């Protein structure tokens, strides 16, 4: 913010000084009647007093040479004419003959030592030569001679002010202040003295005193633009942006082209825009940013903040325009480059995103957010080594950068190192206990190694849910009619209504719901829609349902939307995976709330009533605990709709290869060391057999080598293993099953989409039951298809089943060619019957609600009772004991971060591809609005 400091100039500050530099106090004579003396064209006719009067008139009209000649003519006849000496001195002074002028004034003073006019003009000459002290002494003599002589007082105030400024600039602020006050004592209406006092007090950070002085300066001189400008600076620095803007408006009203004030106005308006935007009025924020550009059209910060605002409004094309403008006008704005990268990354233009992040790092090599974001892109691309390097650099640049540790955890998770992933998530939570992404990623990661031997994973989910629920206010009443048989409004919320694993299991209900009795409302949080999104939307709307796009909308606002839609049963399909809306579910906007499909465990949220499953994935005898009440469907809890891009089933490759190929397309996190041990036993027992594994991280050589090294240590030669990286096109991915004879499921976290895809492409899958839901998903799928014989009860049986399948290539080939039809005729692909079963389940839930049987309300009441009981047991002198940790977990902020656009470290999260069933949440850091 720019201050204006203007050292006053004598000739410009005193109203008693004429335009020609001489004192107005030296008046030309008039006749006895007070009429002006008429000018005669004939000079020689004037003598004595008349000649002096005529000379004064000429001088007033800037005819100094002619006037000087007359004064000298008079002085030749009367050397003691004081008025002529003064007039002569003024004429010489105006012709830049200062020494001769001074001699003339000195002669006048010699004749009349008390002549205030001559003394004052000597002071002016001293000041012109920079001899301020002598000038002041001369003015003081003039005032002593004539205390009422106003020109001397005004000139003295000017020179004292100049002396004060010189002292201030020399570092003697207190002495400078004293001189300013002396100037005010001499002339209490001298505005520049008040103004310069304001400048000094501002520099001394005595802002109340400074404001008072600026206000007095403005009172004495209402057109004092600099005073209004500096008042605005003080108000702006105090955070009183409205008052600052009012001051700048007054400044510009008197001086419309005052560039400093225009720039300051742009800064204040930009800050006000950021303020109102953070308060929730983003449209007004945009208006202020645009107004800032009216005052300073090349102000990069306003352009940058417009980019942030448009990004938050999901108007990404506009955001790109203003980020590029910001960078154009400020080539050092690394934040603009970073936020451009965030947008391009979310648009899947990864090469452009990398280019933007690298540009940001060229400007700021240790810019932790761009280092982190580059690591995010490399992680998505499967470039694990490069990703690790970038994220580690981000942590070195900013050791307290919590989000970077979260992303390091994602990296370890993708590389299959679950223990290191959990450690990284926990490190993130140590730095930022409120990190929603790290908290949920940690829960997801624990599923990969949980065999159900204890309740630690349940307790982790439960504790997370209790803490998370406290961040939201729960609704406890609804206007929904408690008619058990009326049409129900069913809401589904998910970010995965696109070509994603979950989409293959939600399609059947969308297609087969009885919309007359079950009105469907879809809440789509899809980041980037694709053809499948559009197909789903068209299908729902055509059947009379409702489709609402909620990406980027605050979860509390989504809760309000759900209540306005009068949803009776709300089903979330994501759990703790990417872009979930558990914050919305924590508000409990619907009378009945359900979790289904997207996560293989409890959400931990007390506000969710039910978890939909089946008796194969979660047998009635299960010891696995859930916060929600389990509701079991008659067949599988899943219904698979195959991809139309799958293509035909190919012949068994063993027929032409002469050997059997085992394989898995599950993500690497599921392929634990124990899984590899079992697979190695199978491969070693089947001569010449091969293993094909496909997953994204195999694009990185170090990950490939680590994987092969583990298998080699287990006795399997690397030459027998084919590692395939991510295949982008869904058709190509499905056709890759033509390389595989037998699919090997993972444990204790079984495949879901990969198992269905394998069966649909004719590849039988060997799975193994366990004691937790995640372990038993394959059991549910295979039994539902009619392949109970491929379900093992333990590792030895798993190995035996795989060896047995491989031993009879003919039977294997026959099974392959019949599997698709077997699957299509099974309940797993019977969308109509599945949806009827689902609707019956919903109706039962609703009837229970109408009867007052609400699991979540009972659960929450029990929690409150437990807390109250514990509180009553506390000894008064001791600190209160709470069964719930006080560590708060905050909701992620949507939309990008200037503290460091899209917001403070917004959690822009990564969705898994169709071949990976659980998305993890990456923190992609944007930069929020700048304050100047």
UniProtKB/Swiss-Prot annotation:
Induction (free text): Not up-regulated by GA3 or ABA application.
Pfam families membership: Glyco_transf_41, TPR_1, TPR_16, TPR_8
Key words of the record: Gibberellin signaling pathway, Glycosyltransferase, Nucleus, Repeat, TPR repeat, Transferase
GO molecular function, one term: protein O-acetylglucosaminyltransferase activity
Gene Ontology CC annotation, any one: nucleus
Tissue-specificity statement: Expressed in stems, leaves and flowers. Expressed during all stages of corolla maturation.
EC number(s) given by UniProt: 2.4.1.255
Region (Catalytic region): 436-932
Pathway membership: Protein modification; protein glycosylation
Predominant subcellular localization, coarse grouping: nucleus
Iron found in the keyword field: no
InterPro entries named among the record's database cross-references: Glycosyltr_41/O-GlcNAc_trsf, OGT/SEC/SPY_C, Sel1-like, TPR-like_helical_dom_sf, TPR_rpt
One GO process term, biological-process aspect: gibberellic acid mediated signaling pathway
Sequence ranges of Basic and acidic residues compositional bias: 1-15
Function: Probable O-linked N-acetylglucosamine transferase (OGT) involved in various processes such as gibberellin (GA) signaling pathway. OGTs catalyze the addition of nucleotide-activated sugars directly onto the polypeptide through O-glycosidic linkage with the hydroxyl of serine or threonine. Probably acts by adding O-linked sugars to yet unknown proteins.
Comment field on protein domains: The TPR repeats mediate protein-protein interactions. Expression of such repeats in plants generate a dominant-negative mutant.
Protein name, entry field: Probable UDP-N-acetylglucosamine--peptide N-acetylglucosaminyltransferase SPINDLY
